[in-house]
Structure formats: structure tokens, C-alpha cells
A protein has these predicted regions:
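Acidic/glycine-enriched connector segments
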Residues: 22, 34-38, 42-209
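Conserved hydrophobic helix-helix packing surfaces used for dimerization/oligomerization
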Residues: 25-26
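Short amphipathic alpha-helices and their capping/turn segments at secondary-structure boundaries
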Residues: 2-4, 8-21, 148
Length: 211
């Protein structure tokens, strides 16, 4: 067996795998008790699934806190892409779920803050979808927005999903640059009847602001 040849082959394989790994990390903030902006719940869930699939396909690594009504469909999208294409799921998705009990009597709010900080500091981009709970906007999403802005992430509120995402859009759009407004309009000024077109426009808008 030629050891030098094997080492060279292994190096090429490792280099190839390295080049295939995602180059951008995107934090997706979202939760949903209801799915505003879509004609039915199925389309909204398909939108989340397709968005995650296409982000992975375009070499983005998704970071998510597994918010209700959102996290499950992001997971399914990334998983489908990775298993179809023989990719490692861990290279394309990080799930950082929030603790749901206080059995140790730790300060649960403090743990939530630290969890949000750790998720956001890993990322270059923050996208915001839906954000509603019991007919009110999600305070957790607003906290994530402020953290992401503080840390200088590129912000993408998807306002047609309503809730906190719309609230964040209204805060960010009016006084922003023309290029940011162009990207926001590309994302949000479209019918939600065509899920694939929606996702295509979101990817184009992200690339527009990453130039």
C-alpha cells in the first residue's frame, strides 16, 4: 500500500468536504400559533420547509431555537436536503432549544438570554418569521431582534408572515438605505400563492445584502 498516495487522496477528500461546507450562518427567529399571510396552514409550513431546504442547498448553516410551529419544519427541510445529497446534517443545522422546565430552580429567564446570545453570536444573518403567541406578538423574537442588531447581523424580517416579523420590518424599513429597502421589497412585495417564488426571492435578497 502506498502511504503517500493514501495521504494525498485523503487530503483531497478532506479539502473537497471542507469546500462543500456552508460558508454563511443564518439565525432564523420564529414561532407560530397561527400562520398569517398564507391562504392555508399547509402552505405556510411548506414555505418554512422549502426555505430551509433551499438555504442548505445554497450552503447556508441554519441556527434555530426550535420555536413552536417553526422549528419542526426548518428541521424537516434541512434533513431532507442532507439525506438526499449524502450530507452531514450537523454541517447545515444547529438546534438550540430553550429549557422548558425549572426543576433545578435556575433562573429560567437568564438561561433564555444566554441561549439567545449563543445562537446569535454564531451567525452573520438573522431572519425573522411569524412571531405570534396566544394572539399577541412574540416578546422573545423582539429580544432576538435587538440582540442581532446589537451584534451587527444582517437583518431580514419577513413581514408578510405577520406577528413580530411585521413589527421588526416596520422598525427597520423606514430609515434604512435604498439597497436594504430594495432587498426588503424583494422579500415582501409578493403573493404567497407561489411558495417556490417566495423562497427564490428571499435567497436573492440575502445575496443582495451579502455583496
Amino acid at each position: 500500500m502506498n502511504t503517500k498516495t493514501n495521504k494525498k487522496t485523503n487530503y483531497k477528500t478532506e479539502k473537497s468536504e471542507c469546500l462543500e461546507k456552508p460558508i454563511k450562518r443564518i439565525f432564523i427567529s420564529g414561532s407560530a400559533d397561527k400562520y398569517d399571510g398564507f391562504k392555508n396552514e399547509k402552505d405556510a409550513k411548506l414555505f418554512l420547509h422549502t426555505l430551509a431546504y433551499k438555504l442548505a442547498e445554497n450552503n447556508y448553516h441554519i441556527v434555530n431555537g426550535y420555536g413552536k410551529g417553526v422549528g419542526d419544519f426548518l428541521l424537516s427541510g434541512v434533513t431532507e436536503y442532507c439525506l438526499k445529497n449524502n450530507k452531514q446534517i450537523s454541517n447545515y443545522l444547529t438546534i438550540m432549544s430553550f429549557p422548558q422546565n425549572n426543576i433545578s430552580k435556575a433562573n429560567i429567564e437568564e438561561l433564555y438570554i444566554k441561549n439567545r446570545e449563543q445562537m446569535i453570536e454564531k451567525c452573520d444573518i438573522a431572519a425573522f418569521v411569524f412571531g405570534n403567541k396566544n394572539n399577541t406578538n412574540s416578546e422573545g423574537m423582539i429580544q432576538e431582534y435587538h440582540l442581532a442588531k446589537q451584534k451587527g447581523l444582517t437583518l431580514f424580517p419577513i413581514s408578510f408572515t405577520g406577528g413580530s416579523a411585521k413589527q421588526i420590518f416596520d422598525l427597520e424599513y423606514p430609515n434604512n438605505t435604498e439597497i436594504v429597502k430594495k432587498a426588503f421589497n424583494l422579500i415582501n412585495n409578493n403573493s404567497t400563492d407561489d411558495v417556490n417564488k417566495l423562497v427564490e426571492n428571499i435567497l436573492e435578497a440575502i445575496k443582495l445584502l451579502q455583496i
